[in-house]
Amino acid sequence: MLDCRAVIMLWLLPWVTQGLAVPRSSSPDWAQCQQLSRNLCMLAWNAHAPAGHMNLLREEEDEETKNNVPRIQCEDGCDPQGLKDNSQFCLQRIRQGLAFYKHLLDSDIFKGEPALLPDSPMEQLHTSLLGLSQLLQPEDHPRETQQMPSLSSSQQWQRPLLRSKILRSLQAFLAIAARVFAHGAATLTEPLVPTA
């Protein structure tokens, strides 16, 4: 009869032969998240081409607007020690942010634009946002429901300004998320090391 260690080693054999890290039930594939978030950053920058004077326009945000926009903050546990202790708080905040921006990209603000044609930077951004969101969704949890911003119908003249503001905010959010995933990929992915 096989002892317990032999059974565990047989169970881990497929990952050892492929040189993969042993999957954890609560942790994402940090390397894949790093790659997707890096790709998302590039897509967000490509989707928001500078438009001269529009970049100089700074709209003052009221308190309600500031509170609705997801931001990764210190208390979210996205710092190196917070990720090491329990990455779920940080990953939940990133999932919420991705869902928020996906909701905005699905709104009438971005509808009917030539930039949303298949294979356009905006469509690729939308698809990649969805891909990273799905990768971060815990397998044992159904899709989380969260409060989405209530969007009133925008006027045609408002859309370029709103698009620019949303994409700038998304760029900032994705830059921080990419740093989180880069740290996670470098330090939290533990390769399988056989014990003697």
UniProtKB/Swiss-Prot annotation:
Disruption phenotype: Mice have no overt phenotype but display compromised humoral and delayed-type hypersensitivity responses. They also have impaired secretion of IL17 and IL17F, higher susceptibility to Klebsiella pneumoniae and Citrobacter rodentium infection, do not develop experimentally-induced autoimmune encephalitis a mouse model of multiple sclerosis, collagen-induced arthritis a rodent model of rheumatoid arthritis and also spontaneous colitis induced by IL10 deficiency a rodent model of inflammatory bowel disease. Gene3D superfamilies: 1.20.1250.10. Keywords: Antiviral defense, Cytokine, Disulfide bond, Immunity, Inflammatory response, Innate immunity, Secreted, Signal, Tissue remodeling. One of its GO terms (molecular function) is interleukin-23 receptor binding. GO terms for biological process: cell surface receptor signaling pathway via JAK-STAT; defense response to Gram-negative bacterium; defense response to virus; inflammatory response; innate immune response; negative regulation of interleukin-10 production; positive regulation of activated T cell proliferation; positive regulation of defense response to virus by host. GO terms for cellular component: extracellular region; extracellular space; interleukin-23 complex. This is Interleukin-23 subunit alpha. Associates with IL12B to form the IL-23 interleukin, a heterodimeric cytokine which functions in innate and adaptive immunity. IL-23 may constitute with IL-17 an acute response to infection in peripheral tissues. IL-23 binds to a heterodimeric receptor complex composed of IL12RB1 and IL23R, activates the Jak-Stat signaling cascade, stimulates memory rather than naive T-cells and promotes production of pro-inflammatory cytokines. IL-23 induces autoimmune inflammation and thus may be responsible for autoimmune inflammatory diseases and may be important for tumorigenesis. Associates with IL12B to form the pro-inflammatory cytokine IL-23 that plays different roles in innate and adaptive immunity. Released by antigen-presenting cells such as dendritic cells or macrophages, binds to a heterodimeric receptor complex composed of IL12RB1 and IL23R to activate JAK2 and TYK2 which then phosphorylate the receptor to form a docking site leading to the phosphorylation of STAT3 and STAT4. This process leads to activation of several pathways including p38 MAPK or NF-kappa-B and promotes the production of pro-inflammatory cytokines such as interleukin-17A/IL17A. Disulfide bonds: none annotated. It is found in: Secreted.
